[in-house]
């Protein structure tokens, strides 16, 4: 794993390209990547311009796709590992994307997330939300990365479509449904509780009426 000094030197030699670069975001053994221009949340059904709106709010149980502010490019001797910053993980956010970034990759990072917490989580524009750890290989790879994410410029229509197709009922919708069901059950219990003393009263009144009728005979 590369240290802060090694990361800085690799950026200066352009073995690692982070555009726009910011040396202040270099940590002891990692680099913090920021929230980018666009996002998509399962409840909105459309892309959200974070540069204009300022932040993305991910509701409980909601899925979201975010892109990085930085374009990342690795040479053929450098690999990276991607992870969610601990402050967001502690608050209940879970990253659903693979952590490996292969040598030769170049493009905007696109990650899927879900909020497993009972409260909404805000993702401000340009806030550090991902951390990159870099690894220098002893030799260049023979086959640099050339997969479907190569050269991606951000969230694509395919990213959105895949999220919509795999979403089904979100945890948020499940939570709301269970909440409504719990409310109905509580109301039913209340009704049953009221009947528990109303019914004996009705029976008593009925018996009194019957007794009076019998006495009149």
What are the language-model segments listed below?
Residues 1-199, 212-217:
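DUTPase catalytic domain/fold
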Residues 204-211:
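Single-pass alpha-helical transmembrane signal-anchor segments
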